[in-house]
């Protein structure tokens, strides 16, 4: 039997049948706007802000387990001159949400070029086999935040090996786990 992708593991679920969870971090932009945020929301924002500031001109950025692509607004304002952003996620629903929420203006995916000064795209796939959908040596900067804890250890290890495959020789990686 194939393992399932689930939103989150609930009481009574057989964990051996779960491939990964797709539960996402809260949208810290909305949390701050509404005045209801936690230390975790602040930590997530700081991590994303730090990663955006590390991005340099000409870089191809890959956001591993991108969820709703909360990196995009920060990259737009703080990562001047990057070449591209590619978000990778195993969940079609997460990618659809990322595409819908890519701007406050709710642009259609085909109109993102008018809003972002770099190429924006998403890839659906398992990060444990990421080099099947992202060319080896493509990424100049890999951002991998708050995701390893959502998958089995073997897949987590495989995903790190896959990150190295898609990274260019001088690439950077921003990796975090809560």
PLM feature segments, named:
Residues 149-151:
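A short His-aromatic
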């Amino acid at each position: 039997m194939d393992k399932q992708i689930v939103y989150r593991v609930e009481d009574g679920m057989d964990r051996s049948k779960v491939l990964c969870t797709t539960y996402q971090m809260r949208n810290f932009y909305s949390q701050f706007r509404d005045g209801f945020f936690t230390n975790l929301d602040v930590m997530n924002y700081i991590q994303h802000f730090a990663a955006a500031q590390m991005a340099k001109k000409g870089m191809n950025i890959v956001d591993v387990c991108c969820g709703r692509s909360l990196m995009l607004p920060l990259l737009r304002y703080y990562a001047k001159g990057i070449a591209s952003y590619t978000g990778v996620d195993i969940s079609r629903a997460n990618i659809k949400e990322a595409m819908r929420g890519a701007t406050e203006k709710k642009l259609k995916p085909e109109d993102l070029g008018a809003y972002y000064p770099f190429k924006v795209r998403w890839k659906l796939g398992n990060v444990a086999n990421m080099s099947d959908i992202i060319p080896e040596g493509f990424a100049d900067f890999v951002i991998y935040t708050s995701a390893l804890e959502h998958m089995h250890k073997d897949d987590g290890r495989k995903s790190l090996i896959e990150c190295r495959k898609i990274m260019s020789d001088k690439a950077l990686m921003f990796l975090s786990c809560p």
